[in-house]
């Protein structure tokens, strides 16, 4: 799988900004079919950094309920928390 298809978009929130400063981790929304090895290779190829570890979180899709009735579905997604090697940083996330 091509690394441009694996990394969908960066995840920028208060939580990810806090963990970036605390523990050199950055977060991405990734393709649900990608595994940890593919995610690691994609980040290393896209940003030219060394990756120490990758943790993934899967959120399954669920029904959207309004007034007791199912009115739609909430899409599921997969997040990857990537820990960078000591001394590495991604310039894209700096200043956020």
From Swiss-Prot:
Keywords: Ribonucleoprotein, Ribosomal protein, RNA-binding, rRNA-binding
InterPro entries membership: Nucleotide-bd_a/b_plait_sf, Ribosomal_uL23-like, Ribosomal_uL23/eL15/eS24_sf, Ribosomal_uL23_CS
Gene3D superfamilies (UniProt xref): 3.30.70.330
Covalent S-S links between cysteines: none
Entry GO terms, CC: ribonucleoprotein complex; ribosome
Domain of life of the organism encoding this protein: Bacteria
PROSITE patterns: RIBOSOMAL_L23
UniProt entry tagged with the keyword Transmembrane: no
GO aspect biological process, one term: translation
Molecular-function GO terms, alphabetical: rRNA binding; structural constituent of ribosome
SUPFAM superfamilies: Ribosomal proteins S24e, L23 and L15e
Family to which the UniProt record says this protein belongs: Belongs to the universal ribosomal protein uL23 family.
General function of this protein: One of the early assembly proteins it binds 23S rRNA. One of the proteins that surrounds the polypeptide exit tunnel on the outside of the ribosome. Forms the main docking site for trigger factor binding to the ribosome.
Listed NCBIfam families: PRK05738.2-4
Known partners and oligomeric status: Part of the 50S ribosomal subunit. Contacts protein L29, and trigger factor when it is bound to the ribosome.
Name by which UniProt lists this protein: Large ribosomal subunit protein uL23
């Amino acid at each position: 799988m091509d690394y441009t298809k694996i990394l969908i978009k960066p995840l920028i929130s208060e939580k990810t900004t806090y963990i970036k400063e605390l523990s050199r981790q950055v977060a991405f929304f990734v393709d649900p079919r990608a595994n940890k090895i593919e995610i690691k290779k994609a980040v290393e190829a896209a940003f030219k950094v060394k990756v120490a570890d990758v943790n993934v979180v899967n959120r399954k899709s669920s029904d959207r309920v309004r007034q007791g009735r199912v009115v739609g579905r909430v899409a599921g997604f997969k997040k990857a928390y990537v820990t960078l090697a000591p001394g590495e940083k991604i310039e894209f996330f700096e200043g956020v």
